[in-house]
């Protein structure tokens, strides 16, 4: 059974377009989140002593920048792969090679979604502590002192949340692309 006959060529094209679009959005959101957080800095003067706040002061933000940048780079590479594979699908690709590629994409998409989600959750937790403080440990809310820093970091975290949602949608789509190949195999054997 041909790959295109399982969904039909029009439905397959729509799935491929959706995948490329989701990967492009993830690339943009990941790059934007990484850029917003990585370039975030604010300097304040306290009694003639200058204190500078940067994203490296919070290790969760460093993790977020790394995860968002990795997501942007990975999604750019995968978008290029999608464009190349659409051209290759018109030719004959062995089913075993197609299945191996689908498994690799599925595993990488799952790992990316979980890693990005973990980084976003850690950054959100650190942001809540920065915004509200932690009176039990006598940690003050630093957003009262570094307002511009917190606003830009908040915008970066918001972009990262949207990127994590996009990565989860891509994980679902790659699972669909993988398991529909097993559906085609099951229908040919019966």
From Swiss-Prot:
Pfam families referenced in this protein's UniProt entry, alphabetically: CASP_dom (PF04535)
Membrane topology: Multi-pass membrane protein
Membrane spanning residue stretches: 17-37, 60-80, 101-121, 153-173
Cytoplasmic side, ranges: 1-16, 81-100, 174-190
Compartments, as annotated in UniProt: Cell membrane
This protein's record includes keyword Transmembrane helix: yes
Coiled-coil blocks: none
Main localisation: membrane
GO (cellular component) term, any one: plasma membrane
Keyword Hydrolase tagged: no
Chain ranges on the Extracellular side, renumbered to this chain: 38-59, 122-152
Entry keyword set: Cell membrane, Membrane, Transmembrane, Transmembrane helix
Family: Belongs to the Casparian strip membrane proteins (CASP) family.
PANTHER family noted in UniProt: CASP-LIKE PROTEIN 2B1, CASP-LIKE PROTEIN 4A4
Quaternary data: Homodimer and heterodimers.
Protein's UniProt name: CASP-like protein 2U1
């Amino acid at each position: 059974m041909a790959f295109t006959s399982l969904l039909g060529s029009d439905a397959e094209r729509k799935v491929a377009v959706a995948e490329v679009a989701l990967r492009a959005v993830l690339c943009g959101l990941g790059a934007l989140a990484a850029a917003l957080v990585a370039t975030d800095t604010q300097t304040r003067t306290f009694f003639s002593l200058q204190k500078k706040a940067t994203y490296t002061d919070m290790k969760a933000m460093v993790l977020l920048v790394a995860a968002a940048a990795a997501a942007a780079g990975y999604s750019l590479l995968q978008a290029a792969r999608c464009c190349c594979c659409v051209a290759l699908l018109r030719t004959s690709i062995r089913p075993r090679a197609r299945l191996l590629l689908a498994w690799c994409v599925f595993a990488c998409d799952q790992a990316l979604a979980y890693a990005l989600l973990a980084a976003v959750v850690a950054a959100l937790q650190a942001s809540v502590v920065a915004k509200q403080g932690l009176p039990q440990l006598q940690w003050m809310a630093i957003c009262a002192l570094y307002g511009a820093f917190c606003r830009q970091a908040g915008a970066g975290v918001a972009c990262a949340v949207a990127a994590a949602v996009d990565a989860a949608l891509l994980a679902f789509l790659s699972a669909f692309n993988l398991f529909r190949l097993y559906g085609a195999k099951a229908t040919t054997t019966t």
